[in-house]
Amino acid sequence: MQSFSLEKIEEKLKNVKLLVIGDCILDRYFVGEVNRISPEAPVPVFDLKETYFSLGGAANVAANLRGLKVKVELMGVVGRDEHGKILKDLAKKEGIGIKGILEEDSRPTTIKTRVIAQSQQLLRIDKEERKPISKNLEKKFQEIYEEILQEVDGVILSDYAKGMFLSESFCAWIVKEAKRKEKFLMVDPKSVEWKKYEGATSITPNYKEFKETAFKENLSQDNLKESAKILVEKYNLDFLVITLGKDGIFSYHPKEGAIYSPSQAKEVYDVSGAGDTVIASLGAFYAIGLPLKQILELANIAAGIVVGKIGTKPVYWEEIKNFIKENFKEKE
């Protein structure tokens, strides 16, 4: 870990404002116990003890930014339904700006329900509509996006392939408009079609997504540095970040070359939402001008903390600060 002042970082984070635009998801948890088998069929009987909701997808990216003391506006689509109302209420409770969350009558709010017993996930139930947003909604988003862009330092595009960016022309416009306004834009991709992300500051695939893109582009799936270099040049990126799960984070920057940061996870209970934490950390620490190596180290620490939590939960700056003080000697 490099020498840096935690107090200085915290002070700077409080002055940052970012926009998260993407697929908003509501996560619901059924928590209980399994102690017997059903007499009706050879399946376990789940005794429900608790139900709770949390922010997922792009909304979880926004929640992580709030945990890092960054001011946030969130843009995305929900259904005109009870789950959409719950998502917006949760976002407001976290201090997330929601003027960019629009409703669409023809689609339900995306909700993922996880059934958990004895700290283990037994089942996940998804309710979603995977279709592009309407042209009318696109137009409304464009108007709000141009307005919010003037207020923020940068943009995080969180693509979960649920509808926001299934229109390649709309996605490309989002990226180009940020560049035109000289705002950085980082992408957490779902698609292997990176043309729509061209010109972004960075793209942050996980290893599986990187391999799929490399395969499509006829590049080596094993030589990270060589393939990353080609992708950075082809898609006009400032740099590329690849998350490697338990193996940490890899980055390629044309001037700084390849940078590898090992994982800082102590215990892994649940990896859901870890990618959201990484992209939020990259955006927050990039916005305050930290060097890329230090940004990756902090993102790794943040990811290592959230995988030790059960369920989709954000990281908090205090947790990162405590981890560093316990595991590294901080030099002021």
Language-model segments: residues:
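Positively charged, low-complexity intrinsically disordered leader regions
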Residues: 1-35
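Substrate-binding N-lobe of the ribokinase-like
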Residues: 2-10, 39, 43-111, 323-325
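A short, aliphatic-rich alpha-helical micro-motif
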Residues: 13, 149-150, 194-198
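Structural motif
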Residues: 19-21, 124, 153-156, 186, ...
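Conserved phosphate-binding/catalytic loop of the ribokinase/pfkB sugar-kinase fold
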Residues: 101-107, 114-151
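Short acidic, glycine-rich surface-loop motifs adjacent to enzyme active sites
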Residues: 152-165
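Conserved phosphate/ATP/ADP-binding segment of small-molecule kinases
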Residues: 162-258
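Conserved post-catalytic alpha-helical subdomain immediately downstream of the catalytic base
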Residues: 238, 264-327
